[in-house]
Regions:
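Residue-level detector of solvent-exposed, low-hydrophobicity positions
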Residues: 23, 43, 47, 55, ...
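Amphipathic alpha-helical interface surfaces
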Residues: 53, 57, 84, 134-137, ...
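Intrinsic-disorder/low-complexity coil detector
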Residues: 20, 42, 74, 78, ...
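Hydrophobic-ligand binding "helix-grip"
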Residues: 58-129
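Generic hydrophobic/packing signal
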Residues: 36, 42, 63, 86, ...
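Hydrophobic ligand-binding cavity/cleft-lining segments
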Residues: 1-64
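Terminal "cap-and-tail" regions of soluble proteins that handle hydrophobic small molecules
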Residues: 1-29, 116-118, 122-168
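Hydrophobic pocket/interface hotspot
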Residues: 47-48, 57, 88, 119, ...
Length: 168
């Protein structure tokens, strides 16, 4: 766990993701997956809505357009400043969402135990060389979701600590 200071004078605890071996292999070498866990003292439906409802996504991630499982997200802040294509591959609300983002595979699972909702995010099929660049991006987006759910100021990418060396 690391502490990061935001541009608003806030201190937020940020959980690192893990780089794990991927079962699949690429033609040019090893693949890894990025695995993240977060826990929220909120009902699963509240966390699910924050991560899937267009109106809520617009408050912490960016504007969402499109339909029928093919969406475009225009990020409001972050490492990617262009519109991002998202295709929903599988959705079992409020527990599982599998999407393809610009050709990449992302799995999100949510489980509620008592008053705590656990969120597991897995970004699959990452080349080991790209993990250092991609890892901090998903950590940052999860930190924005966390800040949104906790009614805290959203972290800004420009103020975000560089964490590339933590994703090897």
């Amino acid at each position: 766990m690391t502490t990061s200071g935001g541009g608003h004078g806030m201190t937020m605890m940020s959980m690192l993701g893990e780089v794990r071996p991927e079962h699949d292999r690429a033609a040019d070498g090893e693949l890894v997956l990025l695995h993240y866990l977060r826990s929220f003292r909120k009902p699963v439906l509240e966390v699910w809505s924050a991560a899937t409802d267009r109106g809520q996504l617009a408050r912490w991630l960016g504007a969402v357009s499109g339909g029928s499982g093919n969406l475009t997200i225009e990020p409001m802040d972050g490492p990617v400043s262009r519109p991002v294509a998202v295709r929903v591959g599988h959705c079992q609300a409020p527990h599982e969402l599998i999407v393809h983002i610009d050709g990449c595979l992302l799995e999100i699972r949510m489980t509620q135990v008592g008053v705590v909702t656990n969120v597991e995010l897995v970004r699959r099929h990452v080349s080991a060389a790209d993990a250092r660049e991609i890892g901090p991006r998903w950590q940052y987006l999860l930190d924005r979701l966390t800040a949104y759910l906790d009614y805290q100021p959203l972290p800004q990418w420009a103020d975000y600590p560089k964490r590339e060396d933590e994703y090897r």
